[in-house]
């Protein structure tokens, strides 16, 4: 260590200061001071306090919701945070510690309004930072649960969520502040969609008769998150089709037909894994369909068609002439 002269203001007492540059991040330093009077009397050496220079930026990351994800409700916000010390020894980490040292901000992407921990406030307002309780020291987890719900939650809206952290490095408490928000880490956009897709059956036609069916198909549409699949229930009144066989009527089951263009607003679907045996001739087959979107919203009310399974060939008989070898005038019709 080296003793250097410092600036002193006063007479028999006063204050001193010394400006230093070139600090090294994570390094521990000791500062000691001693005084000398005009008579050359010098204070005995006494070790001063040890401190650590922390210039690394803390980081808060969002683990829920993930970027570009879809939800049927507004999820509680969750994430991690660390003080950015990296490989520095524990004793040199300033830590985050306080619950007020992780914050989050929520903004609607349709009208720019910001969440104010209980209500939406008008734009311009972003970012409106809200404290998110943090558990840990130099690293840990944070949560924020007072998210929009009820009348404050609209379907078909995209939301931006930010997170930031502060450490406890002195003298500027609460210390170093995160000022970078990488997409997918500290800045995520997600959407809430509570409205289901809708599906319809275009084949087979309702109230028709068939001796077989090798494909059923239809359309599916969704207004926001996009279509996923059609949910089918195929039954005969005595059993349900599960994709591999018929189940007893007490076991209602469904099969799924993937949309031809997953994620689009409008598409088609088809299902070919149908039974080769539809049971006894005369059975009435019912096909119900419901639409499902990529957020897993499923249509509440199914649309249905019914068709009659008939594999019995018709029979015809000749009544006139009644026997082989007879002779008839052309004026006499042949009939049964």
State the predicted function of each range.
Residues 1-336:
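Low-complexity, disordered linker/stalk regions enriched in Pro/Thr/Ser/Gly
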């Amino acid at each position: 260590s080296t003793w250097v002269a410092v600036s002193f203001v006063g007479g028999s007492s006063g204050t001193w200061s010394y400006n230093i540059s070139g600090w090294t991040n994570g390094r521990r330093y000791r500062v000691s001071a001693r005084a000398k009077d005009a008579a050359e009397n010098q204070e005995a050496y006494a070790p001063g306090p040890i401190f650590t220079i922390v210039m690394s930026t803390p980081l808060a990351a969002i683990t829920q919701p993930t970027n570009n994800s879809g939800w049927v409700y507004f999820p509680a916000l969750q994430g991690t945070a660390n003080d950015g010390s990296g490989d520095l020894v524990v004793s040199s980490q300033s830590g985050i510690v306080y619950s007020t040292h992780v914050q989050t901000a929520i903004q609607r992407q349709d009208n720019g309004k910001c969440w104010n921990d209980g209500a939406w406030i008008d734009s311009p307002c972003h970012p409106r930072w809200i404290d998110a309780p943090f558990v840990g020291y130099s690293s840990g987890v944070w949560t924020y649960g007072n998210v929009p719900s009820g009348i404050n939650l609209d379907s078909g809206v995209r939301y931006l969520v930010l997170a930031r952290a502060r450490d406890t490095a002195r003298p500027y408490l609460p210390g170093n502040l995160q000022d970078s928000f990488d997409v997918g880490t500290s800045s995520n956009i997600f959407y809430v969609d509570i409205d289901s897709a809708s599906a319809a059956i275009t084949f087979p036609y309702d109230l028709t008769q068939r001796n077989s069916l090798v494909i059923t198909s239809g359309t599916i549409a969704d207004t926001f998150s996009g279509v996923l699949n059609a949910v089918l229930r195929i039954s005969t009144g005595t059993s349900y089709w599960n994709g591999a066989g018929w189940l007893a009527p007490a076991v209602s089951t469904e099969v799924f037909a993937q949309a031809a263009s997953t994620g689009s607003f409008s598409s088609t679907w088809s299902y070919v894994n149908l039974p080769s045996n539809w049971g006894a001739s005369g059975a009435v087959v019912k096909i119900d369909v419901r639409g499902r979107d990529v957020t897993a919203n499923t249509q509440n009310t199914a649309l249905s068609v019914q068709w009659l399974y008939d594999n019995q060939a018709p029979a015809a008989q000749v009544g006139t002439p009644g026997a082989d070898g007879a002779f008839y005038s052309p004026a006499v019709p042949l009939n049964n």
